[in-house]
């Protein structure tokens, strides 16, 4: 289990407000896909998603939005820019409160008094936060894999964004109505390679690929992160962010979108996937 932090304080620097967390000696390295929130007695942690890459010779950064908590040597201090939400431990009151804009709070359905904590976590040191379930739960490591797929945390909600058609004839009815959901898996898997998508889709019959508008999703507050084996993951994809096309016909909608929206760009910062005027990735 993660050990308690020694200090947690806010400081002002050139980059604005930052949350500084100093961890105890013996803090275990945490790898893999892991969305986390610190739950520490009498401490508050203000955190912002950060995509700063690991620098050579530097200890790992806490990459919250990417869902990765890297190895942090004992005595090392990590600083994170503060975002519009704050995860606050309230062991005495037994709930976790969020500092979110009111419009996002309403869309997420978060109660004003905060999110109830699992009683087992009141004295715990770390937990995974699932906004969709309104509760915190402890993250147990898998044997030989470290802390991986311990939970999910959605800190955004679908708002006003570019709407892309998904209701073309032949699209599965369930996907048209509900979009892509993880069902029994932890997350929805995405692929940037049409060949890989075709192989996976052909396992259960004829392959039908869906282009995911990751640019619009990201602007709406959804998170994308990458697993150790290179698969892109997200919590869910609403139907309005999908475009259906057949792999067999090689009708890639990017050819149409390029004419209307200009040249392709590369989303190195957010997803590393080729982007076609706001649409990237194949799910």
From Swiss-Prot:
It holds the Pfam family PTS_2-RNA. It comes from Deinococcus radiodurans (strain ATCC 13939 / DSM 20539 / JCM 16871 / CCUG 27074 / LMG 4051 / NBRC 15346 / NCIMB 9279 / VKM B-1422 / R1). One of its GO terms (molecular function) is tRNA 2'-phosphotransferase activity. The keyword Transferase applies. Keywords: NAD, Transferase. It is an enzyme of class 2 (transferase). This is Probable RNA 2'-phosphotransferase. Its EC number is 2.7.1.-. The keyword Transferase applies. GO terms for biological process: tRNA processing; tRNA splicing, via endonucleolytic cleavage and ligation. InterPro entries: Ptrans_KptA/Tpt1 (IPR002745), RNA_2'-PTrans_C (IPR042081), RNA_2'-PTrans_KptA (IPR022928). Removes the 2'-phosphate from RNA via an intermediate in which the phosphate is ADP-ribosylated by NAD followed by a presumed transesterification to release the RNA and generate ADP-ribose 1''-2''-cyclic phosphate (APPR>P). May function as an ADP-ribosylase. Gene3D superfamilies: 3.20.170.30. Belongs to the KptA/TPT1 family.
């Amino acid at each position: 289990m993660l050990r308690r932090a020694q200090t947690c304080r806010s400081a002002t620097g050139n980059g604005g407000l930052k949350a500084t967390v100093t961890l105890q000696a013996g803090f275990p390295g945490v790898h893999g896909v892991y969305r986390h929130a610190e739950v520490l007695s009498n401490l508050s942690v203000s955190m912002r998603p950060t995509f700063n890459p690991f620098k050579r010779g530097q200890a790992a950064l806490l990459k919250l939005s990417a869902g990765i908590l890297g190895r942090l040597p004992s005595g090392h201090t990590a600083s994170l820019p503060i975002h519009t939400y704050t995860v606050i431990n309230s062991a005495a009151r037994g709930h976790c409160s969020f500092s979110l804009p009111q419009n996002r709070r309403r869309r997420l359905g978060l109660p004003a008094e905060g999110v109830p904590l699992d009683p087992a976590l009141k004295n715990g040191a770390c937990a995974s936060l699932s906004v969709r379930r309104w509760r915190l739960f402890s993250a147990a490591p898998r044997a030989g894999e470290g802390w991986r797929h311990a939970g999910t945390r959605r800190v955004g909600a679908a708002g006003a964004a570019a709407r892309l058609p998904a209701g073309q004839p032949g699209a599965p009815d369930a996907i048209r109505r509900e979009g892509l959901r993880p069902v029994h898996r932890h997350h929805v898997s995405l692929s940037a390679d049409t060949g890989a998508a075709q192989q996976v889709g052909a396992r259960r019959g004829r392959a039908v690929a869906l282009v995911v508008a990751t640019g619009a999703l990201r602007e709406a507050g959804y998170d994308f992160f990458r697993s150790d084996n290179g698969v892109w993951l997200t919590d869910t994809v609403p139907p309005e962010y999908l475009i259906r096309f057949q792999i067999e016909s090689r009708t890639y909608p990017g050819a149409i979108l390029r004419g209307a929206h200009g040249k392709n760009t590369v989303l190195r910062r957010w997803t590393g996937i080729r982007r076609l005027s706001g649409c990237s990735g194949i799910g």
